[in-house]
């Protein structure tokens, strides 16, 4: 990470401990010694343990760069902790200890508050102060930021370390407060990067985020419409240049994506390009040319932790694929070429963003986009109840199906049947795969994969529910047509 930061000119704020349990925090330090998490601030043994960790980190030599962390220019500052409730005496001791090991870097007080603590401004070894802002305060983010900036003015640099989970208008107002005050900068919560297996990493916010907000993705897409991602990201980009006194340049044409190996034409993924708003997928019968555009504006945010594209209409045969990234400034050069990919069957893939791929539906089906954490970040689902049904029509004959479902309450069953004429159906027994380790603190729903192979009959597939169920994805394969 430090090597990458140096290559790209990024500077890192690195917290040395977390207040929360997710990455391991003060409770874990205390637990190792049989003490309580509040002892972390005053117990000599726990403080010594933490200082041992600090010494290990700061004096470690990076095996990639050959540079000690304490000497690495990629580090902007060491933060005493993330959102910690540290007493001033603890902060004073830890900040001083950091400075005895590292005279090259700044120290930021990680005390968790929306209003600056006066004591932090008086600690000599604290160089930067910060606040975090989320819903729940009587004052607006902008009011608090202006007051904090005035309080820190002439004493220490002030950074808004996190802010989020409010409307675009309120976020824009907060950014203006950062720009117009003596504040040194601000960071939205939060931005997730691309997955090496294709698409993005996802993080929905069921707590303070109210089951509405998710981590943002650049350059944004309609998948974030519920929280106005496209408009907010445009405002962020504008202000990122404004705070540096720079004129905002046009968006660059994206670089070519990297197409990943393809074993099935229904499972095509690529590593995306920075700034790409969509992707053009192309297919050809040979390496030399004759490329056909088979999809012109694929949104890589449409799927979560699944392949980004299925070539549902590939003719039988062997095919080559490539992908181009695109945005408002133009089209990238082609990706690497992958193939030949042998196609005997093709697969209808329905992510349930809408009901457009369904021939008929019965009952009270609704599209569900909230509760994504409980659904393992699946952002588009069809929610139904006992007796509800879906009907898909495909070219004959259906070969196999896979249906990914969640049971928000009790685990139920799903019935599957096929027909040649949409009149006479016979049931196809499904196998069930369950990978579930409990609801956990987020109330995860039970995920179940229903699947059947070697069907070789029918052109209609009926799906019937026996209880409250949400379907996240449907895959139905059938023979590919001749070229």
Residue ranges of model-derived segments:
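Extracellular fibronectin type III
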Residues: 326-345
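Extracellular carbohydrate-recognition regions
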Residues: 340-369, 483
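Short beta-strands within extracellular/lumenal beta-sheet-rich domains
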Residues: 375-400, 410-411, 447
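Substrate-binding clefts and catalytic carboxylate motifs of secreted carbohydrate-active enzymes
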Residues: 12, 89-100, 106-274
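Conserved structural position at the C-terminal beta-strand
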Residues: 325, 463-465
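Beta-strand-rich modules
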Residues: 311-329
């Amino acid at each position: 990470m430090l090597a990458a930061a140096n290559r790209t000119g990024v500077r890192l704020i690195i917290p040395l401990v977390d207040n929360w349990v997710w990455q391991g925090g003060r409770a874990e330090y205390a637990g190792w010694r049989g003490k309580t998490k509040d002892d972390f601030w005053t117990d000599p043994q726990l403080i010594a343990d933490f200082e041992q960790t600090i010494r290990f980190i700061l004096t470690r030599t990076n095996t990639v760069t050959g540079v000690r962390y304490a000497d690495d220019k990629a580090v902007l500052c060491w933060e005493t902790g993330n959102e910690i409730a540290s007493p001033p005496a603890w902060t004073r001791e830890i900040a001083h200890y950091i400075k005895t090991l590292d005279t090259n870097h700044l120290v930021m007080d990680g005390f968790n508050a929306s209003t600056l603590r006066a004591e932090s401004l008086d600690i000599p070894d604290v160089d930067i102060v910060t606040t975090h802002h989320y819903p729940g305060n009587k004052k607006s983010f902008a009011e608090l930021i202006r007051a904090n900036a005035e309080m820190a003015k002439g004493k220490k640099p002030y950074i808004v370390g996190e802010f989020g989970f409010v409307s675009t208008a309120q976020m824009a107002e907060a950014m203006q407060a950062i720009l117009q005050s003596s504040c040194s900068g601000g960071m939205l919560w939060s931005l997730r990067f691309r997955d090496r297996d294709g698409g993005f990493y996802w993080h929905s916010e069921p707590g303070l985020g109210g089951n509405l907000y998710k981590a943002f993705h650049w350059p944004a897409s309609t998948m974030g419409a519920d929280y106005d991602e496209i408009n907010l990201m445009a405002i962020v980009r504008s202000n990122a240049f404004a705070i540096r006194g720079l004129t905002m340049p046009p968006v660059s044409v994206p670089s070519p994506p990297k197409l990943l190996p393809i074993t099935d034409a229904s499972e095509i993924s690529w590593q995306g390009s920075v700034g790409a708003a969509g992707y053009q997928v192309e297919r050809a019968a040979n390496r030399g040319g004759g490329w056909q555009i088979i999809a012109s504006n694929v949104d890589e945010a449409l799927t979560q932790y699944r392949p980004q594209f299925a070539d549902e209409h590939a003719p039988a045969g062997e095919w080559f694929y490539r992908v181009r990234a695109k945005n408002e400034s133009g089209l990238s050069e082609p990706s690497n070429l992958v193939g030949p990919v042998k196609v005997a069957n093709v697969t209808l893939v329905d992510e349930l963003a809408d009901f457009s791929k369904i021939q008929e539906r019965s009952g009270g089906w609704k599209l569900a986009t909230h509760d994504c954490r409980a659904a393992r970040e699946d952002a588009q689902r069809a929610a139904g109840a006992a007796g509800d049904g879906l009907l898909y029509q495909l070219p004959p004959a259906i070969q196999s199906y896979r249906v990914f479902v969640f049971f928000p309450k009790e685990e139920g069953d799903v019935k599957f049947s096929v027909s040649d004429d949409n009149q006479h159906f016979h049931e196809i027994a499904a196998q069930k795969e369950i990978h579930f380790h409990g609801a956990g603190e987020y109330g995860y729903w039970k995920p179940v994969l229903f699947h059947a192979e070697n069907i070789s009959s029918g052109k209609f597939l009926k799906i019937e529910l026996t209880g409250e169920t949400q379907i996240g994805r449907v895959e139905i394969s059938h023979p590919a047509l001749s070229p």
